UniProtKB/Swiss-Prot annotation:
Belongs to the DEAD box helicase family. DbpA subfamily. A motif (DEAD box) lies at residues 148-151. Residues 30-200 form the Helicase ATP-binding domain. It catalyses: ATP + H2O = ADP + phosphate + H(+). Residues 394-470 are annotated as: Involved in 23S rRNA binding. The gene is dbpA. GO terms for cellular component: cytosol. This is ATP-dependent RNA helicase DbpA. It comes from the Bacteria. Contains an N-terminal domain that binds non-specifically to RNA and a C-terminal domain that binds specifically and tightly to hairpin 92 of 23S rRNA.
Length: 470
């Protein structure tokens, strides 16, 4: 990573995030993206593609510009939040501000956020289009467009909305398209919206074994329990085709499991995802719609309780296992009438999905005790990638904003004059109508908090406190 031509602010962030060695897709994409060329990248899930586009975008945005300069379109809310977090972390020391816009979140609250300075906007197609049509998202200065998981947006029927958004963007812009597969409809999209793009096709790095278990009778629940006991994974994702099936399995399995599907409230979906990512839950039971936003390293087992209805989704599902060079395994339950779909998947992947027999009664009995002990063991909580980067940051709350004619430069001017503080110690600044939030970096938050209690901002004495987490 240190060999890339990046600013010191971006290099510092990626080092603190632990990006010491670039993945193959990052090595291929980042240098080309920094030149402004259009790119089509075929890359599997878990290959590091988010950083592959987030790094060059964070590098190229101009801090002084108030309107969004990059638009990143993704298929799901979970993915929108994850990409936004990644962009924020990578751009932390350059003070790059990113917003996540998606459905089932209050429109008015998003409108207020979009009225602030935002360098990058990440969102789902429908809600992005709503904001553009209503004038709350200005796209006049968008110079970088990313379509992430293009094949997923095609299969979910979002393409008309995506094209509507693209038709409203400036013609002169960089277009970066990322996809795990390359369906024919995507080729049409490339021809219409990209200018002689660099095509980057990454060979699959995965050597993770993939199997299928034949289901002769309707005994999938018992087989699932037996497979979990004999495999005894540290973590596993179980994919179902319906939310009812997700609910039933969550109740049926005698293990601590999180669940995620489109019928849950957004905060419950985020909480379930956080619990699984952190290791509080060893198992996650999910549908495809919700599962597309799952970005978790070190998942040791993926089980397709139901084969996906769309064969392309198989690629996304099994891409959740292993990741980043770690080993993993994928097992699919296949009924007799699903054999044609299994053959289609094998043809698409150009592999043979090996048949695996069901665990025997003896195998289950032998492994049952070890499985129970692992489930009862207190989980080791995993640290989030951005934890090291964010631990020396304090966000301050001030009780004044736009209505008092206060701007970001007023805070920068005042705080940078404090003893021992420079502009490099100031992070992202958010100015709302009646309040403002200022991030203080490098562990200097407590000192700034104390000194600002007796300082004025633009001639006004403002209340200042450490901001509550929102």
């Amino acid at each position: 990573m240190n060999n890339l031509k990046l600013s010191e602010e971006i290099k510092r962030a990626i080092n603190e995030l632990g990006y010491t060695e670039a993945t193959p897709v990052q090595k291929a994409v980042i240098p080309v993206a920094l030149t402004g060329e259009d790119i089509v990248a075929k890359s599997q899930t878990g290959s590091g593609k988010t950083a592959a586009f987030a790094i060059p975008i964070a590098e190229q945005v101009e801090w002084e510009e108030n309107k969004p300069q990059a638009l990143i379109i993704v298929p799901t809310r979970e993915l929108a939040m994850q990409v936004k977090t990644e962009c924020t972390n990578i751009g932390r020391f350059k003070r790059v501000k990113a917003a996540a816009i998606y459905g089932q979140s209050p429109f008015a609250k998003q409108k207020l956020e979009l009225s602030q300075k935002n360098h990058i906007v990440v969102g789902t197609p429908g809600r992005l289009l709503d904001h553009i049509e209503k004038g709350s998202l200005n796209v006049d200065k968008v110079a970088h467009l990313v379509l992430d998981e293009v094949d997923e947006m095609l299969s979910m029927g979002f393409i008309d909305q995506v094209e509507d958004i693209l038709s409203r963007l400036p013609k002169q812009r960089q277009n970066l398209f990322f996809s795990a597969t390359m369906p024919e409809e995507m080729q049409d999209l490339i021809k219409r919206y990209q200018d002689n793009p660099m095509v980057i096709e990454m060979a699959s790095e995965k050597t993770n074994p993939i199997f299928h278990v034949e289901m002769q009778t309707d005994n999938k629940e018992k087989t699932l329990k037996d497979v979990l006991i004999t495999e005894n994974p540290d973590s596993a994702i179980i994919f179902c085709n319906t939310k009812n099936q997700v609910d039933e399995l969550t109740d049926l399995l005698d293990v601590k499991a999180s669940k995620i599907h489109g019928g849950l409230r957004q905060e419950d979906r985020f909480r379930a995802m956080d619990d699984f990512k952190s290791g509080k839950s060893r198992f996650l039971i999910a549908t495809d719609v919700a599962g597309r936003g799952i970005d978790v390293d070190n998942v040791s087992l993926v089980i397709n309780y139901d084969l996906p209805i769309e064969k392309e989704n198989y690629v996304h599902r099994i891409g959740r296992t292993g990741r980043a060079g770690k080993s993993g395994k994928a097992i699919s339950f296949v009924k007799t009438n699903e054999n044609p779909l299994l053959r289609d998947i094998e043809e698409m992947l150009d592999v043979t999905i090996e048949k695996k027999r069901k665990p025997t009664v003896i195998e289950v009995k032998v492994n049952e005790d070890a499985f129970r002990k692992k489930q009862q063991k207190r989980p080791t909580i995993k640290k989030a990638r951005g934890e090291k980067l964010n631990k020396n940051i304090m966000k301050l709350y001030f009780n004044g904003g736009k209505k008092k004619k206060i701007r970001a430069v007023d805070f920068v001017g005042t705080i940078s004059k404090l003893e021992g503080i420079t502009a490099e110690d100031i992070g992202i600044i958010t100015i709302e109508d009646h309040v403002s939030f200022v991030e203080i970096l490098n562990g200097k938050g407590p000192a700034v908090l104390e000194m600002m209690r007796s300082r004025k901002v633009k001639g006004r004495r403002l209340k200042v406190n450490e901001a509550r987490k929102r």
